[in-house]
A protein has these predicted regions:
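Short, intrinsically disordered, charge-balanced linker/junction segments flanking boundaries
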Residues: 206-211
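N-terminal Rossmann-like NAD(P) cofactor-binding subdomain of oxidoreductases
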Residues: 2-202
């Protein structure tokens, strides 16, 4: 009898737009086991934001919470609110991958806190300095040699959109130079109304601006 492959244990640090969307995707995938979520908000707020999404609509499954656990379609996920990754129980939870989508930890030194806490690998969902690799699916994901521990950046949304096109152009025609423009939906970094901000471009109303 062939044994089923061991599920990959995944923990989330950050439960904003990226974190919630990834949990929506992975919660029903039998290859993965979501073992923890660490974020600033309380578990009841996490349950509400996960269930009701203004962009993607209401989650079709069951969502509830009990004590410090988020329960999604019968999966009980322990929740934490710890500021420093080094204090998270990744070793006890046997975490294979931490997905860090906080946007706060953007260099290898800071992200290594997850490894110190017991995680085997870290994927950061933003550009990051000095990491083991920056991988863009469809461009260079097969070029990376897996190590015992890995801290990998998934690059940025603009990079992910642009580099597959550049790869085709470079391979078939060559590129001497170029310029590009991104039209981006507004994010948490912009205010709905004009307000003070160190970056005056971000001080203007997001709904009235082309980001």
């Amino acid at each position: 009898m062939v044994e089923k492959p061991k599920k990959i244990n995944i923990a989330f640090n950050g439960f904003g737009r990226i974190g919630r969307n990834l949990v929506r995707k992975l919660i029903s995938d039998d290859r993965y086991n979501i073992v923890a979520i660490n974020a600033r908000t309380t578990v009841n707020v996490r349950a509400h934001l996960f269930k009701y999404d203004s962009v993607h609509g209401m989650f079709a499954g069951d969502v509830s919470f009990e004590l410090d656990n988020l329960i999604i379609d019968g999966h009980t996920i322990p929740n934490f609110s710890r500021k420093m990754p080094a204090r998270l129980p990744w070793k006890e939870l046997e975490v294979d991958f931490v997905i860090d989508s906080t946007g706060k930890f953007t260099n290898k030194h800071d992200l290594e806190q997850h490894i110190e806490a017991g995680a085997k690998n870290v994927i950061v969902t933003s550009p990051a300095k000095d990491v083991d690799a920056t991988l863009v699916y469809g461009v260079n994901e097969t070029s990376y040699k897996v190590q015992e521990t890995n801290i990998i950046s998934a690059s940025s949304c603009t990079t992910t959109c642009l580099t597959p096109i550049l790869k085709v152009l470079l391979k078939n025609y060559g590129i001497k130079q170029g310029t590009m423009t991104t039209v981006h939906s507004f994010t948490m970094g912009q205010a709905l109304l004009d307000s003070s901000h160190p970056d005056l471009r971000r001080a203007r109303s997001a709904t009235m601006s082309i980001i």
